A protein has these predicted regions:
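PLP-dependent amino-acid enzyme catalytic core
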Residues: 1-127
């Protein structure tokens, strides 16, 4: 692990917990909901992505994603100074593609009717 970057615990935002009176009344159970919508990139996936970017030895990271993990990894790589390529289906939502690019990653769009995302990642990883 590189010591010049924040640890996972200092990089993530705290999880917000919400008690649901409505569910308690309906189900007769105390229900607490953990929400990760305030996490970087709006998803719990930033936790895994940052941990990966922080601990992988390579300077470039390659993944397949339809959006959320790709965004999280792109942002994590930006924070850790690594290059990131995200293989995404060409049918991915434009907002997801733009978000991945906005975090500085290269987006490789693939027609998944002709080749799978993981197959494309495998091909790119041997180059």
């Amino acid at each position: 692990m590189r010591s010049d970057h924040p640890t996972l615990l200092t990089a993530i935002r705290p999880t917000t917990f919400i008690e649901s009176a409505k569910l308690r009344d309906h189900l007769g159970l105390d229900i607490t909901i953990a929400t990760e919508t305030f996490q970087h990139t709006g998803s719990f996936k930033f936790r895994a992505a940052y941990n990966l970017a922080l601990n992988v030895e390579q300077d470039e990271v390659l993944t397949a994603s339809s959006g959320n993990f790709g965004q999280a990894l792109a942002y994590a790589c930006k924070l850790t100074g690594k290059k990131c390529t995200v293989v995404m289906p060409s049918t991915s939502a434009r907002v997801k593609i733009d978000a991945v690019r906005g975090y500085g990653a290269t987006v490789d769009l693939v027609d998944t009717t002709k080749v799978g995302r993981n197959e494309r990642v495998d091909r790119k990883s041997v180059v």
